[in-house]
Amino acid sequence: MEKLTIRDVDLKGKRVIMRVDFNVPIKDGVVTDDTRIVEALPTIKYVLEQGAKVILLTHLGRPKGGPDPKYTVKPAAERLAQLLGKEVKFVPALYGEEVEKAVAELKEGEVLMLENTRFDPGEEKNDLELAKKWASLADIHVNDAFGTAHRAHSSNVGIAQYIPSVAGFLMEKEIKFLSKATHNPDKPYVVVLGGAKVSDKIGVITNLLNKADKIIIGGAMMFTFWRALGKQTGNSLVEEDKIDLAKQLLEQAKEKGVELVIPTDAVCAQKMEAGVEKKVFTCEEGIPEGWAGYDIGPASIELIKSKLADAKTIVWNGPLGVFEIEDFANGTKAVAEFIASLTDKGVTTVVGGGDSAAAVSQFGLEKKFSHVSTGGGASLEFLEGKELPGIASIADKKKQ
């Protein structure tokens, strides 16, 4: 890893301002899923053990350009205190006298959390005045928020113009696994792409046609490919304006010798809800009017397993069906379990964040993959081969 991390700097007695990703679901003032807080614990604990004073910054939700009590990060501070087993001081502000006083009183090994970074509209504009205010509170910046790495905001990118920025453990792990998967994967390298829209994945498919040995398509975007193959898709979700593009991608894959695997059957229903009548239609026969596909069918599951069997590196981004409804979760679950079983055989298995990470945890498989990314949009842009601003802003290691 070519970036400086918290291991590379002296933290004793330093004021450390740390950008974490505590964008967690909250109901009635209580955190309902603390996964993201738990994932930041190793970084926070390490920095505290080194004798630093820690100031935490995070966003939560999408407040409309100003403070909104619904999006306060106070419940996240309370949950963190329980997990750490120590007090987490909370100031309901982002800068100003109250914040400066709290920072001045902070002792080594203590934690202070500031309010939701997005309560200041400058955050998402990468306002440098705002970044300067935060930088003035600390000696060093720790970036452990991979989930926002594809965004240039004041709290992760702007601040690095004024004080040195280093990676936390979570950020380091994300970069390590995703870099390996995108830059020098052990081959055969197989990518599984699901989700509803081809348009969301065009950049990824185009970039991976130069890197992957096989690309497996699933989720509703498979129907745009079925249409490109001249097949009927009934009432399934199809991006009409992307059918020609799907044809081009099929052609490009052929030219580059990359196997683009399209599911051969689908589990269909007349309504997207649990307990309705379901039928399996094949790509060849097509899906009749009034029916729509909501999952890959049994033949597709076997086809996909056979294409994954010899892989040495697997990256999976996007569910293969509407996994939130049990009737249509079978394809995603079967493929997730199969990929998980390959991890034990020494295959590097990486799950992109977002819906695929949610699916993996719904099936209780999150410990069974080499790496489950914490960033949906960020992992997608990483796979597109883009440089992410929130990684570029972290200081580079000096070449020895």
From Swiss-Prot:
Enzyme Commission number(s): 2.7.2.3
Record's keyword terms, sorted: ATP-binding, Cytoplasm, Glycolysis, Kinase, Nucleotide-binding, Transferase
Binding-site list for ATP: K201, G293, E324, G353, G354, D355, S356
Record-linked CDD domains: Phosphoglycerate_kinase
A GO term, aspect molecular function: ATP binding
Gene Ontology CC annotations of this record: cytosol
A Pfam family the protein falls into: PGK
Compartments (UniProt record): Cytoplasm
Family named by the database record: Belongs to the phosphoglycerate kinase family.
HAMAP family: Phosphoglyc_kinase
Protein name per UniProt: Phosphoglycerate kinase
Underlying gene: pgk
